[in-house]
């Protein structure tokens, strides 16, 4: 099955982010618990929704080569205010590495992202003249699942390239 995904090449700078690390199978990780921890941290520190925030999940390991139970991911809120904050509990401050990326835009439920990744890595990337770098990739969430129907969720996949 060939999916139609919008794609573009984009360069971005390093950005500081609040993050909560999860370890284990990407398909069963407790993302909502991690998001709740970060949002509660923001509320406790009177940052509100962190203003200009980007909501991102960074995937640090390749599930094709790393055992599922050892796969690491960081659930992140990246915003300018992060520079003024301190780590606390499970909430850390990390840098999301910038660089050159191929970006794919997917519209649909998060439950379909596994199929999207299969499509991207087995069909779409092989048709592009880009070299994927062995670095962390990330998802950027463009709307809020609390207020958006699953079929209307917008997720960008940011894959580092040469």
Name what the model sees in each region.
Residues 1-162:
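A solvent-exposed interaction/effector surface
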């Amino acid at each position: 099955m060939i999916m139609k995904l919008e794609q573009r090449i984009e360069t971005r700078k390093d950005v500081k982010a609040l993050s909560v690390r999860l370890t284990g199978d990407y398909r069963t990780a407790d993302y909502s618990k991690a998001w709740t921890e970060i949002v509660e941290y923001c509320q406790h520190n009177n940052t509100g929704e962190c203003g200009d925030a980007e909501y991102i999940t960074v995937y640090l390991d390749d599930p094709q080569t790393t055992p599922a139970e050892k796969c690491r991911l960081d659930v992140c809120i990246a915003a300018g205010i992060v520079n003024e904050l301190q780590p606390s509990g499970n909430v850390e401050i990390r840098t999301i590495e910038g660089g050159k990326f191929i970006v794919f835009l997917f519209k649909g439920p998060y439950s379909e992202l596994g199929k999207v990744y299969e499509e991207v890595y087995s069909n779409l990337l092989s048709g592009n003249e880009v070299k994927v770098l062995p670095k962390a990739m990330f998802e950027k969430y463009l709307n809020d699942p609390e207020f958006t129907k699953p079929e209307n969720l917008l997720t960008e996949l940011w894959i580092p390239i040469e």
